[in-house]
């Protein structure tokens, strides 16, 4: 039997080290839970128990494969697994000696729930450490005491925020919330897992006296009903329900269910609350939404695993040149500096454009600063990494990776790319042209970001006919460092996302020519699950981009037929380009959508017919992409559309089986 734990006894304190076999991270699976229980026997022989990690993470959470299996498992089996976790964590909480979690890395889901059951928690002062209860992102809720203990520890409003959003907190925020008792200084590059026993013992010995003194008080706090006045309770839960309903909507039941559990359990004892938590988990884990969101989780993990494998064989560039300081170039430069910590030389022929790019970066960082997400020193560091220039040679001669992000003009892109040293790695951010039509050498490939760069997680990494594996590896490595999810594909017009979106928008244009009401269509597709309908999407992307994209699609693929009387073309030629011009299908005041601007047909059909008509061309194009080997797996298409186009995650993806049963 493989061991998940080791232990050591130092000065009558038992140290239990989590060390998941054959894994880079620690995870809680059924075997780990069973083995953990054995380490709690004879606990009264010790002064305290300390939970530590032998890996760079503390505990990354429950094994999602086991959660996925619960969808088809009998209710009794799910009850058994959840109850086992409750039983063991209750044993930890009820010990007559203090318990301490030393959080040296990510503590997520069941890992954080273990820490919550302990008397105390300390975390390394490392801003890369994330602590979270992300279960609602998988369509479930924290089932090993998270909805019970966290509100009692940090307050209902803070717990609702963390549980219902699934967001992570860093060490300093965790300290301010009361989630941890102390933040332990560490040197750059160090991890608490590497402490010698003597150093570890000193850290623990300093913490234990206070935990011994407050043992009963702390346990009572987590086992007793929440202390909220009637007014506090009404305000907290009423406001939270309104906010969560608006954000999550009807298609994502987990956040509201988690809120309901927290609210209903506020007057219960610990054991009563845990029972309610278990019942809610068993309901959610059987929903199609949970199954779909778990499929998304695995799909993303597969994409990142592929990219990480390619990236592991190459070195990280030391600096990057970005050509073009427009919306995309400015966003790419900021993300490189902010997320990847890479020096950037941002080039543009316009001083005004460069100034605008830097101002935009500063505004973005000021927003993060005002919310407490970063410090002023961190904001200054990011800005110091971005250097601007109007000298193209400076931007192309010094960096060892160059990303071209100028407007979609073939001659301009070709000129800039061909002026780059072919011994350097060069990527184009084109959205409409084939990579091979711009250039064809081994160090050149595609790196297609989506707007806005700061928010959109997908990057299409495009291999042209001559692009080397090393180049693809470098582009993947940089994308991962930027916090993106790369999908590697072969070269074709539109790549994956735009090639799939254009048939959808072309079909929409044809429906307008037949007299359909675009406002009605927008509502129907939003009800389907899209964040916006096709008319609003055209306005946000820009009718000029839609026009050129449609033309490009029809030239590249002879089976594509455009609308004979195109509303999109009509608006484009009237310079009604959407949000950027103030009017398109709708009137716009900045980023606020107003009344309809374009003429609207009277025709309305049954929503299901409209949805199927618009989605069918997209699915047909997806089949062609697979047949052509642009990508090889349906999950690559599913993830591309979810992360690059906003396809509704609760449906599992464009080609997911649940897409039809959930609609």
Model feature map: region roles:
Residues 2-8, 19-21, 67-74, 79-84, ...:
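N-terminal glycine-rich phosphate-binding loop for ADP-containing cofactors
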Residues 88-101:
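Conserved catalytic cysteine-centered active-site region
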Residues 64:
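Glycine-rich phosphate-binding loops of nucleotide-dependent enzymes
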Residues 56, 128-130, 350-352:
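Helix N-cap at the beta1-alpha1 junction of Rossmann-like dinucleotide-binding domains, i.e.
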Residues 1-52, 76, 83, 90:
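Conserved CoA-thioester-binding segment of acyl-CoA-metabolizing enzymes
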Residues 56-60, 108-109, 433-434:
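Short, active-site-adjacent cap segments at secondary-structure transitions
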Residues 101-111:
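Gly/Ser-rich catalytic serine loop of serine hydrolases
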């Amino acid at each position: 039997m493989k061991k998940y734990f080791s232990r050591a006894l130092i000065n009558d304190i038992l140290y239990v080290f989590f060390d998941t076999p054959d894994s880079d991270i620690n995870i809680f699976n059924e075997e780990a839970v069973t083995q953990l229980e054995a380490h709690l026997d004879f606990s009264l022989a010790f002064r305290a128990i300390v939970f530590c990690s032998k890996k760079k993470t503390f505990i990354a959470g429950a094994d999602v494969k086991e959660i996925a299996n619960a969808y088809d498992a009998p209710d009794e089996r799910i009850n058994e697994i959840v109850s086992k976790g409750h039983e063991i964590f209750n044993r930890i909480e009820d010990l007559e000696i203090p318990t301490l979690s030393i959080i040296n890395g990510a503590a997520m889901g069941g890992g954080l729930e273990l820490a919550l059951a302990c008397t105390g928690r300390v975390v390394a002062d490392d801003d890369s450490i994330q602590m979270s209860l992300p279960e609602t992102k998988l369509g479930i809720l924290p089932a090993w005491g998270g909805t019970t203990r966290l509100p009692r520890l940090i307050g209902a409003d803070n717990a609702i925020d963390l549980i219902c959003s699934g967001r992570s907190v860093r060490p300093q925020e965790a300290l301010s919330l009361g989630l941890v008792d102390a933040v332990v200084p560490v040197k750059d590059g160090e991890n608490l897992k590497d402490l010698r026993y003597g150093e570890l013992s000193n850290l623990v010995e300093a913490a234990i006296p206070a935990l011994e003194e407050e043992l009963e008080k702390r346990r009572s706090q987590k086992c007793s009903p929440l202390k909220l006045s009637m007014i506090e309770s009404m305000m907290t839960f009423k406001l939270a329900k309104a906010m969560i309903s608006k954000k999550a909507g009807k298609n994502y039941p987990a956040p509201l269910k988690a809120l309901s559990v927290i609210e209903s359990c506020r007057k219960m004892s610990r054991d009563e609350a845990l029972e309610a938590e278990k019942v809610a988990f068993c309901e959610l884990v059987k929903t199609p939404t949970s199954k779909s969101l778990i499929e998304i989780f695995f799909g993303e993990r597969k994409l990142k695993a592929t990219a990480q494998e390619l990236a592991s064989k190459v070195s990280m560039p030391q600096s990057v040149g970005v050509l073009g300081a427009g919306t995309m170039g400015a966003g790419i430069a900021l993300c490189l500096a902010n997320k990847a910590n890479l020096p950037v030389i941002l080039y543009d022929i316009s001083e005004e454009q460069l100034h605008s790019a830097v101002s935009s970066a500063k505004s973005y960082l000021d927003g993060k600063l005002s919310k407490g997400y970063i410090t002023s020193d961190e904001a200054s560091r990011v800005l110091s990494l971005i250097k601007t220039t109007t000298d193209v040679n400076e931007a192309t001669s010094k960096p060892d990776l160059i990303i071209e992000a100028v407007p979609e003009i073939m001659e301009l892109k070709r000129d800039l790319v061909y002026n780059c040293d072919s011994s350097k790695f060069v990527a184009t951010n084109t959205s409409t042209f084939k990579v091979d039509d711009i250039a064809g050498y081994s160090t050149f490939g595609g790196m297609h970001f989506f707007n806005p760069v700061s928010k959109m997680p997908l990057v299409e990494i495009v291999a042209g006919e001559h692009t080397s594996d090393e180049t693809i590896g470098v582009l993947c490595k940089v994308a991962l460092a930027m916090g993106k999810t790369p999908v590697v594909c072969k070269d074709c017009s539109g790549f994956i996302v735009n090639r799939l979106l254009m048939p959808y928008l072309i079909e929409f244009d044809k429906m307008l020519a037949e007299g359909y009401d675009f406002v009605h269509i927008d509502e129907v597709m939003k009800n389907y699950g899209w964040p916006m309908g096709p008319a609003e999407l055209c306005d946000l992307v820009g009718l000029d981009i839609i026009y050129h994209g449609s033309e490009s699609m029809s030239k590249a693929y002879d089976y594509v037929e455009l609308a004979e009387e195109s509303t999109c073309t009509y608006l484009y030629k009237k310079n009604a380009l959407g949000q950027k011009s103030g009017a398109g299908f709708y009137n716009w005041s900045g980023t606020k959508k107003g009344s309809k601007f374009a003429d609207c047909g009277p025709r309305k059909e049954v929503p299901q017919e409209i949805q199927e008509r618009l989605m069918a061309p997209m699915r047909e194009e997806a089949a062609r992409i697979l047949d052509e080997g642009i990508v090889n797996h349906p999950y690559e298409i599913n993830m591309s559309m979810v992360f690059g186009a906003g396809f509704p995650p609760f449906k599992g993806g464009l080609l997911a089986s649940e897409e039809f049963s959930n609609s």
